[in-house]
């Protein structure tokens, strides 16, 4: 995916079969015409509104500038990434830009970790909750690096959200 404009490390197996007698080289040449220089995480996050960490449990329905909105009027910065994703369309809404609850210890871990670091980083050694089981939980916490391709974002963030710590915000 990263070779085709998606700033995530998503690998896929694609099998193509045909009975038309089209040579596989022709198909792959056509696919690889769309290959491009990869975008990085910063390209996708650039210009989005700052959000604070949500410190109150159970406040999912609260919508404001600090915690985010399900839908809000928004002027996107016109960047190469924006043009690649949206073409000439002018998008005037930002959807589902919301934070989630984090406990105070996790917020402190997020603040201390440098970009690209995981649970084994010395900056969080004194507050790491899984110290004794570091071999198992070495990537329980992972702070994304804005200058890299992002790890694959999963649909079950409820369980893995500490593996996708925002690169420059403590959330």
Short names for language-model regions:
Residues 65-171:
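C-terminal target-recognition/interaction regions appended to catalytic cores
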């Amino acid at each position: 995916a990263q070779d085709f404009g998606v700033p995530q490390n998503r690998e896929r197996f694609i099998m193509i079969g045909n009975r038309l007698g089209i040579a596989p080289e022709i198909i792959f040449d056509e696919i690889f015409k769309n290959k491009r220089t990869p975008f990085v995480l910063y390209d996708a996050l650039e210009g989005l509104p700052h959000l604070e960490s949500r410190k109150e449990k159970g406040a999912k329905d609260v919508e404001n500038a600090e915690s985010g909105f399900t839908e809000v009027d928004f002027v996107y910065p016109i960047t190469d990434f924006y043009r690649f994703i949206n073409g000439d369309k002018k998008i005037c809404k930002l959807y589902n830009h919301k934070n989630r609850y984090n406990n105070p210890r996790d917020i402190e871990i997020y603040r201390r970790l440098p970009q690209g670091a995981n649970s084994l980083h010395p900056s969080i050694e004194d507050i790491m909750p899984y110290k004794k089981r570091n071999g198992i939980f070495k990537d329980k916490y992972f702070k994304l690096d804005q200058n890299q391709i992002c790890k694959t974002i999963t649909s079950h963030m409820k369980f893995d959200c500490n593996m996708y710590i925002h690169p420059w915000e403590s959330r």
